[in-house]
Protein backbone atom coordinates (compact mmCIF):
# COMPACT_ATOMS: atom_id res chain seq x y z
CA UNK A 1 0.00 0.00 0.00
CA UNK A 2 1.20 3.52 -0.76
CA UNK A 3 0.34 5.84 2.12
CA UNK A 4 3.25 8.22 2.23
CA UNK A 5 2.85 11.47 0.41
CA UNK A 6 5.69 13.89 0.99
CA UNK A 7 5.27 17.59 0.20
CA UNK A 8 2.66 17.18 -2.51
CA UNK A 9 2.02 20.66 -3.81
CA UNK A 10 -0.39 22.00 -6.38
CA UNK A 11 0.49 22.24 -10.03
CA UNK A 12 0.92 26.05 -9.96
CA UNK A 13 0.53 26.26 -13.70
CA UNK A 14 3.54 24.09 -14.33
CA UNK A 15 2.64 23.37 -17.92
CA UNK A 16 3.62 26.92 -18.80
CA UNK A 17 7.22 26.45 -17.68
CA UNK A 18 9.84 25.83 -20.34
CA UNK A 19 13.18 24.24 -19.59
CA UNK A 20 16.30 25.53 -21.28
CA UNK A 21 18.50 22.89 -22.89
CA UNK A 22 22.27 22.53 -22.79
CA UNK A 23 24.84 20.37 -24.48
CA UNK A 24 25.11 17.35 -22.23
CA UNK A 25 21.38 17.09 -21.64
CA UNK A 26 20.88 15.89 -25.21
CA UNK A 27 17.56 16.34 -26.94
CA UNK A 28 15.56 14.66 -24.22
CA UNK A 29 15.54 10.91 -23.80
CA UNK A 30 12.86 8.60 -22.44
CA UNK A 31 13.59 6.24 -20.88
CA UNK A 32 16.75 7.52 -19.21
CA UNK A 33 18.73 6.68 -16.09
CA UNK A 34 21.65 8.55 -14.54
CA UNK A 35 23.67 7.78 -11.42
CA UNK A 36 26.62 9.14 -9.48
CA UNK A 37 30.24 8.08 -9.92
CA UNK A 38 31.76 5.33 -12.05
CA UNK A 39 29.94 2.62 -10.11
CA UNK A 40 26.93 3.96 -11.96
CA UNK A 41 27.90 2.18 -15.19
CA UNK A 42 27.07 -1.27 -13.81
CA UNK A 43 24.13 0.11 -11.84
CA UNK A 44 22.72 1.81 -14.93
CA UNK A 45 23.04 -1.40 -16.93
CA UNK A 46 20.83 -3.22 -14.42
CA UNK A 47 18.33 -0.38 -14.34
CA UNK A 48 18.27 -0.15 -18.13
CA UNK A 49 17.16 -3.77 -18.49
CA UNK A 50 13.95 -2.78 -16.73
CA UNK A 51 13.47 0.55 -18.48
CA UNK A 52 14.02 -0.74 -22.01
CA UNK A 53 11.32 -3.38 -21.50
CA UNK A 54 8.80 -0.73 -20.51
CA UNK A 55 9.24 -1.24 -16.78
CA UNK A 56 8.61 1.26 -14.04
CA UNK A 57 11.29 3.76 -13.06
CA UNK A 58 10.83 2.81 -9.40
CA UNK A 59 11.80 -0.79 -10.08
CA UNK A 60 14.75 0.37 -12.16
CA UNK A 61 16.26 2.63 -9.51
CA UNK A 62 15.91 -0.05 -6.85
CA UNK A 63 17.48 -2.83 -8.89
CA UNK A 64 20.16 -0.53 -10.25
CA UNK A 65 21.71 0.52 -6.94
CA UNK A 66 21.40 -3.01 -5.57
CA UNK A 67 24.27 -3.89 -7.90
CA UNK A 68 26.52 -1.48 -6.03
CA UNK A 69 25.22 -2.52 -2.61
CA UNK A 70 26.13 -6.09 -3.48
CA UNK A 71 29.84 -5.41 -4.07
CA UNK A 72 32.10 -7.09 -1.51
CA UNK A 73 34.93 -4.55 -1.36
CA UNK A 74 33.21 -1.32 -2.19
CA UNK A 75 32.17 2.05 -0.96
CA UNK A 76 28.43 1.63 -0.41
CA UNK A 77 27.22 -1.67 1.04
CA UNK A 78 28.36 -4.01 3.79
CA UNK A 79 31.85 -4.07 2.29
CA UNK A 80 32.38 -0.38 3.05
CA UNK A 81 34.45 1.30 5.74
CA UNK A 82 33.02 1.06 9.27
CA UNK A 83 32.29 3.75 11.83
CA UNK A 84 34.74 4.58 14.63
CA UNK A 85 33.55 1.61 16.65
CA UNK A 86 34.18 -0.81 13.80
CA UNK A 87 30.60 -1.34 12.63
CA UNK A 88 29.28 -0.81 9.10
CA UNK A 89 26.01 1.12 9.16
CA UNK A 90 23.95 1.75 6.04
CA UNK A 91 21.43 4.39 4.96
CA UNK A 92 19.12 4.53 1.95
CA UNK A 93 16.00 6.17 0.60
CA UNK A 94 13.70 5.76 -2.39
CA UNK A 95 10.94 7.91 -3.89
CA UNK A 96 8.40 7.28 -6.64
CA UNK A 97 6.32 9.30 -9.09
CA UNK A 98 3.46 9.71 -6.61
CA UNK A 99 5.62 11.32 -3.91
CA UNK A 100 5.59 8.09 -1.92
CA UNK A 101 8.92 7.62 -0.18
CA UNK A 102 10.70 5.35 2.25
CA UNK A 103 13.96 5.52 4.12
CA UNK A 104 16.18 3.56 6.49
CA UNK A 105 19.16 4.79 8.47
CA UNK A 106 21.77 3.40 10.84
CA UNK A 107 20.94 -0.07 9.56
CA UNK A 108 23.36 -2.91 10.33
CA UNK A 109 23.88 -6.39 8.83
CA UNK A 110 21.32 -6.03 6.03
CA UNK A 111 22.73 -6.32 2.50
CA UNK A 112 20.18 -4.24 0.61
CA UNK A 113 19.01 -1.18 2.55
CA UNK A 114 17.40 0.24 -0.59
CA UNK A 115 14.96 -2.66 -0.70
CA UNK A 116 14.18 -2.24 3.00
CA UNK A 117 13.50 1.45 2.32
CA UNK A 118 11.03 0.44 -0.37
CA UNK A 119 9.29 -1.91 2.05
CA UNK A 120 9.02 0.96 4.54
CA UNK A 121 7.35 2.99 1.81
CA UNK A 122 4.97 0.26 0.73
CA UNK A 123 4.18 -1.59 3.94
CA UNK A 124 4.23 0.91 6.79
CA UNK A 125 2.54 4.25 7.50
CA UNK A 126 5.98 5.82 7.96
CA UNK A 127 8.70 7.40 5.85
CA UNK A 128 11.79 6.49 7.90
CA UNK A 129 12.90 3.69 10.22
CA UNK A 130 16.29 3.74 11.95
CA UNK A 131 18.69 1.55 13.88
CA UNK A 132 17.51 -1.60 15.59
CA UNK A 133 13.92 -0.83 14.63
CA UNK A 134 14.85 -0.74 10.96
CA UNK A 135 16.76 -4.00 11.34
CA UNK A 136 13.86 -5.66 13.16
CA UNK A 137 11.49 -4.58 10.40
CA UNK A 138 13.87 -5.87 7.72
CA UNK A 139 14.13 -9.28 9.37
CA UNK A 140 10.34 -9.43 9.72
CA UNK A 141 10.14 -8.84 5.97
CA UNK A 142 12.42 -11.76 5.25
CA UNK A 143 15.78 -10.01 4.84
CA UNK A 144 18.54 -12.23 6.28
CA UNK A 145 20.98 -10.94 8.88
CA UNK A 146 24.44 -10.97 7.34
CA UNK A 147 27.74 -11.43 9.11
CA UNK A 148 29.07 -8.35 10.84
CA UNK A 149 32.60 -9.18 9.70
CA UNK A 150 34.38 -6.39 7.85
CA UNK A 151 35.52 -6.89 4.27
CA UNK A 152 39.26 -7.33 3.78
CA UNK A 153 39.66 -3.81 2.41
CA UNK A 154 37.58 -2.26 5.18
CA UNK A 155 39.40 -4.14 7.92
CA UNK A 156 42.76 -3.00 6.58
CA UNK A 157 41.59 0.62 6.34
CA UNK A 158 40.09 0.51 9.83
CA UNK A 159 43.27 -0.87 11.41
CA UNK A 160 45.26 1.84 9.67
CA UNK A 161 42.88 4.52 10.93
CA UNK A 162 43.04 3.21 14.50
CA UNK A 163 46.78 3.94 14.67
CA UNK A 164 46.10 7.66 14.99
CA UNK A 165 42.40 7.82 15.73
CA UNK A 166 40.89 10.24 18.21
CA UNK A 167 37.40 9.50 19.45
CA UNK A 168 35.94 12.98 19.47
CA UNK A 169 33.85 15.12 17.12
CA UNK A 170 35.92 16.52 14.27
CA UNK A 171 34.32 19.87 13.77
CA UNK A 172 36.46 21.04 10.86
CA UNK A 173 37.36 17.69 9.34
CA UNK A 174 36.75 19.09 5.87
CA UNK A 175 39.97 21.09 6.26
CA UNK A 176 42.06 17.92 6.60
CA UNK A 177 44.40 17.25 3.68
CA UNK A 178 45.28 13.73 4.79
CA UNK A 179 44.40 10.95 2.32
CA UNK A 180 43.20 8.93 5.32
CA UNK A 181 41.23 11.67 7.04
CA UNK A 182 38.47 10.82 9.49
CA UNK A 183 35.87 11.39 6.83
CA UNK A 184 35.04 10.46 3.27
CA UNK A 185 34.58 11.74 0.67
CA UNK A 186 37.97 13.41 0.85
CA UNK A 187 40.68 14.19 -1.65
CA UNK A 188 43.17 11.35 -2.12
CA UNK A 189 46.87 11.77 -2.89
CA UNK A 190 46.20 11.13 -6.58
CA UNK A 191 43.66 13.96 -6.67
CA UNK A 192 40.62 11.70 -6.92
CA UNK A 193 37.77 11.63 -4.41
CA UNK A 194 37.06 8.70 -2.11
CA UNK A 195 33.28 8.47 -2.35
CA UNK A 196 30.76 6.38 -0.50
CA UNK A 197 27.35 6.94 -2.09
CA UNK A 198 25.42 6.05 -5.20
CA UNK A 199 22.38 8.08 -6.15
CA UNK A 200 20.21 7.26 -9.15
CA UNK A 201 17.28 8.98 -10.86
CA UNK A 202 15.32 7.71 -13.85
CA UNK A 203 12.41 8.43 -16.16
CA UNK A 204 10.51 5.57 -17.78
CA UNK A 205 8.65 5.25 -21.08
CA UNK A 206 5.48 6.49 -19.38
CA UNK A 207 7.30 9.68 -18.44
CA UNK A 208 7.25 8.86 -14.72
CA UNK A 209 10.19 9.68 -12.47
CA UNK A 210 11.72 7.88 -9.50
CA UNK A 211 14.96 7.98 -7.55
CA UNK A 212 17.10 6.09 -5.07
CA UNK A 213 20.12 6.82 -2.90
CA UNK A 214 22.16 4.38 -0.82
CA UNK A 215 25.33 4.77 1.23
CA UNK A 216 27.53 3.49 4.02
CA UNK A 217 28.09 7.05 5.17
CA UNK A 218 31.42 8.59 6.03
CA UNK A 219 34.15 6.12 6.84
CA UNK A 220 35.19 6.16 10.51
CA UNK A 221 32.30 8.48 11.37
CA UNK A 222 31.05 9.00 14.90
CA UNK A 223 28.65 6.23 15.78
CA UNK A 224 25.12 7.32 15.00
CA UNK A 225 26.10 9.96 12.45
CA UNK A 226 23.71 10.38 9.51
CA UNK A 227 24.32 12.33 6.34
CA UNK A 228 22.01 13.47 3.60
CA UNK A 229 21.54 10.17 1.78
CA UNK A 230 18.51 8.80 3.69
CA UNK A 231 16.84 12.20 4.00
CA UNK A 232 14.11 12.97 1.49
CA UNK A 233 14.70 16.49 0.21
CA UNK A 234 18.42 16.41 0.96
CA UNK A 235 19.96 13.32 -0.63
CA UNK A 236 17.05 12.69 -2.99
CA UNK A 237 13.89 14.37 -4.22
CA UNK A 238 11.36 13.57 -6.94
CA UNK A 239 8.51 15.73 -8.25
CA UNK A 240 6.84 13.94 -11.12
CA UNK A 241 5.64 17.20 -12.67
CA UNK A 242 9.13 18.71 -12.74
CA UNK A 243 12.10 16.40 -12.29
CA UNK A 244 14.29 14.43 -9.91
CA UNK A 245 17.65 15.02 -8.27
CA UNK A 246 20.13 13.26 -6.01
CA UNK A 247 23.30 14.27 -4.21
CA UNK A 248 26.68 12.89 -3.21
CA UNK A 249 29.53 14.19 -1.11
CA UNK A 250 29.72 15.96 2.24
CA UNK A 251 26.24 15.22 3.54
CA UNK A 252 26.12 17.86 6.24
CA UNK A 253 26.43 20.59 3.63
CA UNK A 254 23.77 19.03 1.42
CA UNK A 255 21.40 18.91 4.41
CA UNK A 256 22.01 22.57 5.21
CA UNK A 257 20.49 23.66 1.91
CA UNK A 258 17.99 20.80 1.42
CA UNK A 259 20.05 20.20 -1.68
CA UNK A 260 18.07 17.82 -3.89
CA UNK A 261 14.81 19.60 -3.17
CA UNK A 262 16.50 22.88 -4.06
CA UNK A 263 17.66 21.44 -7.39
CA UNK A 264 14.12 20.35 -8.26
CA UNK A 265 12.72 23.72 -7.24
CA UNK A 266 15.30 25.41 -9.43
CA UNK A 267 14.02 23.31 -12.35
CA UNK A 268 10.48 24.32 -11.40
CA UNK A 269 11.61 27.90 -11.86
CA UNK A 270 12.84 27.22 -15.38
CA UNK A 271 16.45 26.13 -14.89
CA UNK A 272 17.88 23.33 -17.00
CA UNK A 273 19.02 20.30 -14.96
CA UNK A 274 22.65 21.36 -15.20
CA UNK A 275 21.98 24.94 -14.19
CA UNK A 276 19.67 23.79 -11.40
CA UNK A 277 22.53 21.71 -9.99
CA UNK A 278 24.98 24.57 -10.44
CA UNK A 279 22.75 26.95 -8.51
CA UNK A 280 22.56 24.47 -5.62
CA UNK A 281 26.35 24.14 -5.55
CA UNK A 282 26.63 27.93 -5.56
CA UNK A 283 24.28 28.03 -2.57
CA UNK A 284 26.65 25.77 -0.64
CA UNK A 285 29.55 28.09 -1.42
CA UNK A 286 27.50 31.08 -0.33
CA UNK A 287 26.55 29.42 2.96
CA UNK A 288 29.90 27.82 3.76
CA UNK A 289 32.37 30.17 2.12
CA UNK A 290 34.90 29.56 -0.63
CA UNK A 291 37.83 28.62 1.59
CA UNK A 292 35.92 25.98 3.56
CA UNK A 293 34.57 24.53 0.33
CA UNK A 294 38.01 23.95 -1.13
CA UNK A 295 38.61 20.73 0.81
CA UNK A 296 35.21 19.08 0.46
CA UNK A 297 33.24 17.68 -2.43
CA UNK A 298 29.52 17.89 -3.15
CA UNK A 299 27.88 16.95 -6.41
CA UNK A 300 24.32 16.93 -7.70
CA UNK A 301 22.74 15.22 -10.70
CA UNK A 302 19.25 15.79 -12.06
CA UNK A 303 16.81 14.95 -14.83
CA UNK A 304 13.71 16.83 -15.87
CA UNK A 305 10.35 15.75 -17.20
CA UNK A 306 11.59 16.10 -20.78
CA UNK A 307 14.35 13.55 -20.27
CA UNK A 308 17.16 16.09 -20.15
CA UNK A 309 19.94 15.58 -17.62
CA UNK A 310 22.83 17.40 -16.00
CA UNK A 311 25.15 17.60 -13.03
CA UNK A 312 27.44 20.02 -11.22
CA UNK A 313 29.92 19.87 -8.34
CA UNK A 314 32.22 21.90 -6.16
CA UNK A 315 35.56 20.43 -7.18
CA UNK A 316 37.02 18.79 -10.24
CA UNK A 317 36.76 15.01 -10.06
CA UNK A 318 33.05 14.27 -9.82
CA UNK A 319 31.47 12.29 -12.62
CA UNK A 320 28.21 10.52 -13.32
CA UNK A 321 26.92 7.75 -15.55
CA UNK A 322 24.23 8.25 -18.20
CA UNK A 323 22.27 5.53 -20.00
CA UNK A 324 19.48 5.90 -22.55
CA UNK A 325 20.13 3.02 -24.99
CA UNK A 326 21.74 -0.40 -25.09
CA UNK A 327 24.90 1.14 -26.51
CA UNK A 328 24.64 4.46 -24.67
CA UNK A 329 25.91 3.95 -21.12
CA UNK A 330 28.75 6.39 -20.57
CA UNK A 331 30.46 8.69 -18.08
CA UNK A 332 30.10 12.46 -17.98
CA UNK A 333 32.57 14.66 -16.12
CA UNK A 334 30.71 17.05 -13.88
CA UNK A 335 31.35 20.74 -14.35
CA UNK A 336 32.68 22.46 -11.24
CA UNK A 337 32.93 25.94 -9.79
CA UNK A 338 36.09 25.93 -7.64
What are these regions (language model features)?
Residues 2, 8-16, 25-338:
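Alpha/propeptide regions of enzymes that mature by internal proteolysis
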